[in-house]
Amino acid sequence: PSLVDPAYLLAEIMAKTQRGGQDVSLGECSGQGQMRLRPQAVTRALDNLIGNALRYGTKARLSYHLTDRALRLAVEDNGPGIPAPRREEALRPFARLDEARDPNHGGGVGLGLSIAADIARSHGGVLRLGQSADLGGLMAELVLAR
């Protein structure tokens, strides 16, 4: 693990997505400081979450909140979301819930959320799935212990 500033990490991810022409915006970001994490692993988790967001929706929004205890990184989209009863299932390896979302936008093998959840656990955290209050689709929140 390295000492990383979450603002810098998100700036790098935003630059990469914008170079790729993807509709990803930066939402609310709060808290300052650095924390120990594996930047390549966290970037991979966020790339997976952004990829899912853009597969099922047309836009995504990234945000973070850093506190004394945790870093919360959220990826929200405007897609159909995942029904609450199926969210736990969606975190399992090879889970494909395309019929719950949009069968025309599948194509993954069902590992993106599972990998992100594993990366969260390796940082003493968790991946939470919910509904985006603003965009209406899925909100995937990577919570990493500080």
Predicted features and spans:
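Conserved micro-motifs of the catalytic ATP-binding
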Residues: Q34-L37
